[in-house]
Amino acid sequence: MTNFDSKKLNKHWTIEDSISTYGIDKWGDQYFSINSLGNISITPNRNSKKTIDLFKLVNEIKSREINTPLILRFNDILKDRITELNNAFSQAIETYNYKNIFQGVFPIKCNQQKNVLEKIIEYGDYWDFGLEVGSKSELLIGLSLLENKKSLLICNGYKDKKYIEIAILARKLGKQPIIVIEQIDEVQRIIEAVKNLRSTPILGIRSKLSSKSSGRWGKSVGDNSKFGLSIPEIMLTIKELKEASLINEMKLLHFHIGSQISDISVIKDALQEASQIFVELSKLGAPMKYIDVGGGLGIDFDGTKTSSNTSTNYSLQNYANDVVATIKDSCEVNNIQHPIIISESGRAIVSHCSVLIFDVLGTSHVSSQIKVSHQKKTSLIIKNLIDTHNQLKNLRNKKEDLSEIIELWNDAKKFKKDCLVAFRLGFISLGERAYAEELTWACAKEISSHLDNEKIIHPDLSEITETLSSTYYANLSVFKSIPDTWAINQIFPIIPIHRHLEEPICKGNFADLTCDSDGKLNNFIDNGKIKSLLNLHRPEENNDYLIGIFMAGAYQEALGNFHNLFGNTNVIHIDINEDNTYKIKNIIKENSKSEILELLDYSSDNLVESIRINTEFAINNKTLSIEEARKLIDQIETSLRKSSYLSE
């Protein structure tokens, strides 16, 4: 690891400084905080005294030879999120004197992991919490896991004949599947299946809303949205169901306005439109019993409580209040019975419970490469840079003049560009070009050393911070473990899980293990804004520098891919005890290289045998000894059994 000047450490750095730097008091939502040791603490029930030191936990897990990168999943946080959601709706129902109940479902697509779904069903059983499925595979999962006869199984997605028949027959098992009509051609398939099976389903209908949504998923609504029926199609569906004597099975209205809705006004508009559609369906003769408000309940990734894409300008209680109040108002005006309210709030349930931990393998610091020394022979173009550097050094003893500093920095950039042109034309050597780059970095370092942070962000000087920034090499694959950062520029809270009694004197970003330029983490939360560099510590010799990515429990594992053949990480499910000890409930082991290769139809045995044959040729040609061949095969066989990530 790179050495650093200990004199630059701020001995007065406090935990409060770290809290302010990383904003954990805002986005942590009382689940995550910094303790007196300078480590991240996990408090699964927010205001309770039950807490655990995350850094200590990770080290104890590693002592079991379970290596990073790894996902820690805190069951108690998952339980708390389900409880909070149900309590919020219970409070809203009581406040507004609503004459029915809330009955949530979890959309399996958010996190299909068996252990997660089992815990959601266990923790939600008191409220008859159900599941939402969007494919035949998810339908089979839902049917196998849901045992509570009152829990709902909302059947969304494209539906062929088999999907519909399975859902209809599942009613005879005592299940509560509701087939939601999302495409107009599903109506005739349902009618045909009912005739063939002589059994009736519970039906719902998904409406395309005209209300405008916002944010990254704003196109989930409107006439061109992927799913749902237009108003004319809804009218046609009602007509066809009446003709087939199935109108009495139409009991649910569903709508969806996108994921992670940041602005509560968008939700209110959609609720008003959907509530009126619900009323009209009742007037058309359908015995409407449920209204499914879909997903969209957002979480506050940056802690600013604003309508930015990384936040929400409403609380969970605000959301529940608006859902309940709006539906009630529409029903009472039209003398319609209050329906059971369903939500498909996946991200809000599972995001907080998962923390991705990775270690830093090494760093690259531009400042460590600055070794400016006088060279005997220098071209005029290099001398210009030397003069600029000397002028900046002389400013140390002069009154700070921002305009002069800006002028000198612009000169340095111009002279560096001149050197590049000269190198391309063959007028200067590779060594001289290296010297020019070192001089430019030295100029940036001089400016940074005697300007405070407020002036360094002047538009003409802001790139200096980027110039002097560090790259931290992360032992993970962005594409496997946190793909939304690459695919949709999603921002997650990222923070060291220890050393918060020390000032993070570096600014840097992360490069992952893949051979892909997109494999970087370079967008970070900054008090409602997005910054490209994160405050970080210099890694220490022989000590792991551990980083946590928080609120990453939704979608990431399902969407991750095997880019460069990096596989699944270790996943550990944790229960925290009342005495602040913990219990490891489940360990889901990472993929070995052999397992990853077999997913792509490579046989590990055949691979080893192929290499062994090559070693025999090499032995015969005397380019490889028998001992070297044995060592090579042993290394390969051992490697195939081990993780795809780097380890000691």
From Swiss-Prot:
Magnesium as UniProt keyword: yes
Q: Quick one: which residues bind substrate?
A: 291-301
Give residue numbers for the modification (N6-(pyridoxal phosphate)lysine).
109
User: Which reaction(s) are listed as its catalytic activity?
Assistant: L-arginine + H(+) = agmatine + CO2
Q: In which pathway does it act?
A: Amine and polyamine biosynthesis; agmatine biosynthesis; agmatine from L-arginine: step 1/1
InterPro entries, alphabetized: Ala_racemase/Decarboxylase_C (IPR009006), Arg_decarb_HB (IPR040634), Arg_decrbxlase (IPR002985), De-COase2_CS (IPR022657), De-COase2_N (IPR022644), De-COase2_pyr-phos_BS (IPR022653), Orn/DAP/Arg_de-COase (IPR000183), PLP-binding_barrel (IPR029066)
Record function comment = Catalyzes the biosynthesis of agmatine from arginine.
Q: What is this protein called?
A: Biosynthetic arginine decarboxylase
